[in-house]
């Protein structure tokens, strides 16, 4: 029983620390997109964005380090970034891959920054399904439509053509920070937050 009590106390302690960190992050208008992109993450991030937007129109800082995940969950965050009034200043860190890159691309280009050692991954959506041939064909068509939509999004974000995006992402398309700048995905590589130019400055 003592072990259980200690475990419970430890869990409560970690939860309290996490709550305090979240409270402070919201106070300084910072949102962290870390780990796999799924429904829970999307819900949490979108709620934070709307809370911050309701407080003021000051810029929001979003740090992205994600291996990707569900495209639809990435869409939810992408649309929220575009929906709210405050500008979102995006900082890529570590790995910005797949659905993580989709979220990153939601910010205006002048507000997209990268730390020096960040790697970016663009690729076509993938997935598997089992069932009747008719369902498989429907799923295949939806994957094609999703790919075309993502091609358009990344074309708009980078200045590349949808055709080039489509060709480049036929296989995993990795970019380091410098290459991401050349490709048009990143505006500027920074090593300090002092190098960020706030909207309107």
UniProtKB/Swiss-Prot annotation:
Purpose of the protein: Cleaves peptides in various proteins in a process that requires ATP hydrolysis. Has a chymotrypsin-like activity. Plays a major role in the degradation of misfolded proteins.
Assembly and interaction partners: Fourteen ClpP subunits assemble into 2 heptameric rings which stack back to back to give a disk-like structure with a central cavity, resembling the structure of eukaryotic proteasomes.
UniProt KW Protease keyword: yes
Gene: clpP2
Keyword terms, alphabetized: Cytoplasm, Hydrolase, Protease, Serine protease
CDD domains: S14_ClpP_2
Molecular function terms from GO: ATP-dependent peptidase activity; ATPase binding; serine-type endopeptidase activity
Biological process annotations from GO: protein quality control for misfolded or incompletely synthesized proteins
Protein family: Belongs to the peptidase S14 family.
Record EC number: 3.4.21.92
Name of one Pfam family that matches: CLP_protease
Entry's localization field: Cytoplasm
Active site: 98 (nucleophile), 123
Enzyme class: hydrolase
Organism: Pseudomonas aeruginosa (strain ATCC 15692 / DSM 22644 / CIP 104116 / JCM 14847 / LMG 12228 / 1C / PRS 101 / PAO1)
Catalysed reactions, semicolon-separated: Hydrolysis of proteins to small peptides in the presence of ATP and magnesium. alpha-casein is the usual test substrate. In the absence of ATP, only oligopeptides shorter than five residues are hydrolyzed (such as succinyl-Leu-Tyr-|-NHMec, and Leu-Tyr-Leu-|-Tyr-Trp, in which cleavage of the -Tyr-|-Leu- and -Tyr-|-Trp bonds also occurs)
GO cellular-component term (any): cytoplasm
PANTHER family per the UniProt record, alphabetical: ATP-DEPENDENT CLP PROTEASE PROTEOLYTIC SUBUNIT
UniProt name for this protein: ATP-dependent Clp protease proteolytic subunit 2
């Amino acid at each position: 029983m003592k072990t259980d009590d200690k475990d419970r106390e430890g869990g409560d302690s970690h939860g309290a620390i996490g709550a305090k960190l979240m409270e402070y992050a919201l106070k300084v208008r910072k949102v962290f997109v870390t780990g796999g992109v799924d429904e829970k993450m999307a819900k949490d991030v979108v709620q934070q964005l709307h809370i911050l937007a309701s407080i003021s129109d000051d810029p929001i800082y979003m740090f992205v380090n994600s291996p990707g995940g569900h495209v639809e969950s990435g869409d939810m965050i992408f649309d929220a970034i575009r929906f709210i009034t405050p500008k979102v200043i995006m900082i890529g860190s570590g790995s910005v891959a797949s659905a993580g890159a989709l979220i990153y691309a939601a910010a205006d280009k002048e507000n997209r920054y990268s730390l020096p050692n960040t790697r970016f991954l663009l690729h076509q959506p993938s997935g598997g399904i089992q069932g009747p041939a008719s369902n498989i064909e429907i799923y295949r068509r939806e994957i094609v439509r999703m790919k075309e939509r993502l091609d358009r999004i990344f074309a708009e974000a980078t200045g590349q053509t949808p055709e080039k995006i489509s060709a480049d992402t036929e296989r995993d398309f990795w970019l380091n920070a410098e290459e991401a700048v050349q490709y048009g995905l990143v505006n500027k590589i920074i090593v300090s937050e002092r190098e960020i130019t706030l909207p309107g400055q």
